[in-house]
C-alpha cells in the first residue's frame, strides 16, 4: 500500500508538470461485471459505480480539468430489465439531488447539464434534472455533463432535424449551415466543448456511440479495471498518455 501511494504521488507530480486536458469524457463500464465478481446484485454494482463517480469528480477538479462528461445510460440500455432501469434512474435522481445539496457544487461553481433524450426518462427524474440545471445555470468555473438516454448518432440526427425545421420556417438559409450551427443544436446546445481525452473502463476497446461529433479528434484511453475499481493512478496514466500523444503530434 505504501509503495502504491509513493508511485501515485510520483505520477501526480509528473502529470502536473504538463498540460491538463480541458474536457475529459468517461464511459463508466463494468458495474455489472464488478457486481458479479463480488457476488452482489446489479444495483449494488451501480451504487458502487456512483460512489466512484463522486470520487473521480474531485480528482478531476483538483487536477485542473474544467469539463467532465460521464456516460451514465445509453439509449441501448433501455433493453435492460424494468427492475434494473428503475434502480438506475433512482440512483441518478439521488446523485443529482446530492449535487444540489453539496456545498462543493457552489464553491467550485459547478454547472450541471444532462444530455440525452430526456423525454424517455421518468417524470420525477426529469423534474430533478430541470431543478439541478436551473440551480447551477450561472456557474462558469467547472462543468459536469451527464449523458442519460444518450445515443451519439441520434444526437446528430436530432440536431439536423432541428436545423431543417428552422430552414422550413425561413429562420435559417441553407448556405448558413456550418459546423458551429450544428454544434449549437446538439444536446449541449454548444455549451460543451470538444473532448480532449475519452476514457473507457471495463476492458472493451470501443466508444459505443458516445460523443462521435465532440470526440472526433480526441485521444482514447482504454483500461481493464471495472469502473467501481478505477483508481487515481488509472486517471493519471490516462492523462499521461494524452500528454504524450499531444507532445508528439505532427503539426
From Swiss-Prot:
Residue sites binding substrate per the record: 30-34, 46, 74-76, 78, 80, 200, 206-208
Pfam families, per database record: Prenyltransf
Keyword field contains Repeat: no
The entry's keywords: Magnesium, Metal-binding, Transferase
Catalytic reaction(s) noted: geranylgeranyl diphosphate + 7 isopentenyl diphosphate = tri-trans,hepta-cis-undecaprenyl diphosphate + 7 diphosphate
Disulphide linkage map: none
Single GO molecular function: magnesium ion binding
One biological process term in Gene Ontology: polyprenol biosynthetic process
Residues that span the membrane, as ranges: none
InterPro entries xrefs: UPP_synth-like (IPR001441), UPP_synth-like_CS (IPR018520), UPP_synth-like_sf (IPR036424)
EC number of this enzyme: 2.5.1.89
Domain of life: Archaea
Transmembrane listed as a keyword: no
Entry cofactors: Mg(2+)
Co-factor: note: Binds 2 magnesium ions per subunit.
Xref: HAMAP family: ISPT
The family this protein is said to belong to: Belongs to the UPP synthase family.
Subunit structure: Homodimer.
Protein name stated in the entry: Tritrans,polycis-undecaprenyl-diphosphate synthase (geranylgeranyl-diphosphate specific)
Gene assigned in the entry: uppS
